[in-house]
């Protein structure tokens, strides 16, 4: 999991994260960075 900022928007890159761990990672990311909305989550 990589968190980075691009053009003023915080991104979460989930490449390489196991499917079983994604839900927990996304919830933690949103709670931690909710004041910086909009957020982008990259999966694929």
Regions found by a protein language model. Name each.
Residues 1-44:
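Long, charged, low-complexity intrinsically disordered regions
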């Amino acid at each position: 999991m990589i968190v980075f900022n691009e053009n003023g928007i915080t991104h979460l890159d989930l490449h390489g994260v196991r499917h079983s761990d994604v839900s927990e990672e996304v919830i933690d990311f949103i709670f931690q960075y909710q004041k910086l909305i909009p957020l982008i989550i990259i999966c694929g």
